[in-house]
């Protein structure tokens, strides 16, 4: 019986829900241990079956939401959300209530309050300043803890109870949890795209060529140990090519799988908007697909 896809209750930047069926066709079967190295909003973790899940992300504020979910029953979480929404008068038109609630969260940093804030923020998006204060504006007529988000929370809850979370820089993750035949998925910031976390000005480590090379070195070492990996990335974006990525794939003989996805809704104003973006999944193992080939 096919497993039902579940959407995370967080609309995390770069989430893979819309393409999860595409990338999962290239995942190994019968996964024992899975590591999601840049777990973000958890869409990949909660939709991938494994005997044991590890989920890591440097953004501890978001990870703490899921950790807080693990501490409480589902009824307790939903009751807290409903009571808090009523107490503050949160709605999709009450900007004053939103701003007051945001100020309160930035003082207390209670994870469930952050979850509620995200529900009422512009496009349900997540953003912090360099002091780790939530600074997304109000989502007028667009923000609400609605039926869909409630359903996503309910469906996600049962899939995270046994996940082991961590908030380390990816270089410091304990890869000893992985043995030959285990699986790692990596969806890092994309070096040549518009991700807001590439600039390193929001309180978390930025992403540049050094981080890119560090990740490839780690994946190479894991591959040499017999660990399977899948890496999401873009090889081409608005006239730029990620030569570091392509050279590494070519040198190692890894496999490229094309993914159909549109990044035109990037938050940044970009030139050359008519130039293509090529979303790819790289694996260190072959998969049967017409869209699969090796540069080696």
Give short role names for the model-derived ranges.
Residues 130, 134-141, 190-212:
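Mobile active-site "lid"/loop adjacent to the S-adenosyl-L-methionine
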Residues 171-175:
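Short loop/turn elements that flank and shape the SAM/SAH-binding pocket of Class I
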Residues 250-296:
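Class I S-adenosyl-L-methionine
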Residues 23-26, 34-48, 52-60, 115-122, ...:
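Conserved proline-anchored active-site loop of SAM-dependent methyltransferases
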Residues 213-262:
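Conserved Class I SAM-dependent methyltransferase catalytic core
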Residues 1-29:
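Class I SAM-dependent methyltransferase Rossmann-like catalytic core
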